[in-house]
Structure formats: structure tokens, C-alpha cells
């Protein structure tokens, strides 16, 4: 059995470890575009607050660990195309430029997600950061040393956690959210209000129903955050506008929802029985938090 895993995310490496532990005779190949594997971005806030002391501890495993289990891991390799009809993939070696084909019996799509970059004027400003990967986590950590006033744009999980992290490090934090309550995809208004009170108790300035429309340079090397309600001068802004699944390789070949997340059954199989999906690339079939956001899941 030849299993191919695209993406060495937490989900991809966990799948490789499980397969090789239970079925060591399986030939497992992992293709990864980056030079590192299994970075757990959801724990970035733990690094910023010092609970995790070393950024390297945010890696779920290492290429050496996977090789020891028997996996063939190819970093700096970008999968260009998947042909599900013939069970082949086209891969580019990003260091040499070589392009080649490979085959699989079973494929696991663990390509994760990418940060949503909203169309905000000035979002490419040097004082505006994103939050997802290893390099961005290091930038955020360095920013703690030099900045006192920080604007967080977006109050989903990541934005809310970052607001708490920066506030705990004695930074002045403003949290902007275009919705009427924070964590609106996960919590109902009552629980969200309780979370807001906790943030405010830690001196986080929460701005609800306030959409950021632009970033410009201000006086004294400041960054100006522009909204319809007013302008705010800060030292740094971090945009946490959500994530989109990296599933373009399978678009039109397996069933997806309207956001591009791959639909799976209870065994994480896609509509193609030889292709599985895990992590941010696929839907979540059971989310108990939805019970608190809407009555519809209970109907």
C-alpha cells in the first residue's frame, strides 16, 4: 500500500505517525512546500506569553522523527496537480526546479489553511503583521519588545487570544471586530459578552461593529488605523481575519462546501473513497460549540 500525504501540517504528520505505528509496512510519502513540518500555529499565543519558551517547541514532530518511523518526507516540494482518475500527482522540487510525477493508492489531503488577507488599503504596511506560520510568529514575538500600543483586527479565536497575550505583556491593546460580538462563529452573545468582560478586565479596548478600512503612516513613525468611526494611532497592527482551506488542488474532483472545505464522512473519506482529508482542509462534522450559537443544530 502506497499512501501519499500532501502537507506536513499537524494533521498530516499525525496521520503519518498513526499509519506507520499501526502498519509499518506501508510506504508513506509526505510532500511539503516549506522547510519545516507540523508547526502548531494555534499555540502562537502561548509562545508570546512565555508559557512556551522556545518557538521550536511549537513543532509537533520533526523530519528526523518521521524518517525514523519509515516515512519518506520531501520538504521544499510543491504539488502542482492531482489527477484523481489516474491516481497521480505532479510535483516540483522547489530547490532544483525538477518536475516529476508520482502515484498513490491512498491520498491524504492535509494542506491546512492560509490566512485571509482582506482588501484593506495599506495592509502591506511594514507595521501590519499577519499571524499563521513560524516566521510570522517570530515577528510577533519581536514586536513585543518594541511596541506598546497594538491593534488587533478580527476577534475570532486567533485575534482574541492575541489580544489577551499582548495585554498580559503590558501592551495597550485595541481589538477591532466588525460583528456585534466577538467569537461570533463559535459563541452566542451571552458567552461572548462574558469573554468581552474578561478582556476589558485586562484593559483590552474592545471595538465592536467597527470595521477597519485602512492603514496609513502617522506622525512620529506611528501607524494609523482607519475606521468609519475614527482614526487610531498605534505602534503595530496584527490582522486576524480568518483562514481559508488550501484545497485548490482538488477543486472539481471531490465534494466541497461553499468555503472550499472538503466534505468528509465519519472516516474522513472524501467523495473519492481513495482520498482522505484532515485538519483545516476539511469540514468539521461535529462541533459542540454550535449548540451555543444557534438553535438549528438541535432541530
Where are these regions (language model features)?
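Residues that mark the start of a beta-strand
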Residues: 2, 27, 140, 148-149
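A Rossmann-like FAD-binding core segment of flavoenzymes
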Residues: 25, 70-95, 102, 169-265
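Beta1-alpha1 glycine-rich phosphate/pyrophosphate-binding loop at the start
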Residues: 1-72, 163-187
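Glycine/serine-rich phosphate-binding loop and adjoining beta1-alpha1 elements at the start
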Residues: 98-137
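Catalytic nucleophile loop
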Residues: 12, 156-159
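A short, hydrophobic C-terminal helix/tail in secreted or cell-surface proteins
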Residues: 295-299
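FAD-site-proximal beta/loop scaffold in flavoenzymes
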Residues: 124-147, 231-294
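Glycine/Thr-rich phosphate-binding loops of Rossmann-like dinucleotide-binding domains
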Residues: 117-118, 160-161, 184, 247-248, ...
